[in-house]
Amino acid sequence: MSAQIQFNAKMSIQEYLAFEEKSAVKHEFAAGQAFAMAGASERHNRISGNLFAHLHAVCKASQCTPYISDMRVKIDQVIYYPDVMVACDAADRDPYLKTAPCLVVEVLSPATERIDRGEKLYNYRQIVELNAYVLISQNEIRVDVYRHSGVQWLFESYALLSDAVHLDCPKTVLSLAEIYERIEFPNTQAQVGLS
């Protein structure tokens, strides 16, 4: 997710949806307010693209569909644009927003990390169908996973390129080397995936 600019005008979710339909800029919606989303960095886009490419290949043989950055997710009176998500529920048919994703991924930035780890973590965990909420750092090799065990939410953290994240929905294994392929990190000359 990118940095946000808040509008002070309170609005209903219906007013937000009508406003968003005509807007040239994407806005997330929480607490009755629209928040404009700013652009994302090249690293952010590459990480999202790497992840989407993997999930697209995995989902081809299933009823699941991966989405990247422009599909909204609605949780009660809150609407976000996750960086990547996967929805498998055939009843979740709205062409502009989903309510039952099984996987939600946010690529962290300094401007949004607090929201992604706080407000969004709380709200996403309200989605009954959600199996995992994944947070990916774009400034270091680090992937944090909040996974629903069926009874409680568990936290896992990965920080080595040789690590792999196992997902139940869709059923796949994501290597950190694949997530960070062709990513240059600040303060190093290393670029993952190129020799």
Residue ranges and their predicted role:
Residues M1-S195:
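Gly/Pro/Ser/Thr-rich low-complexity, intrinsically disordered segments predominantly at protein N-termini
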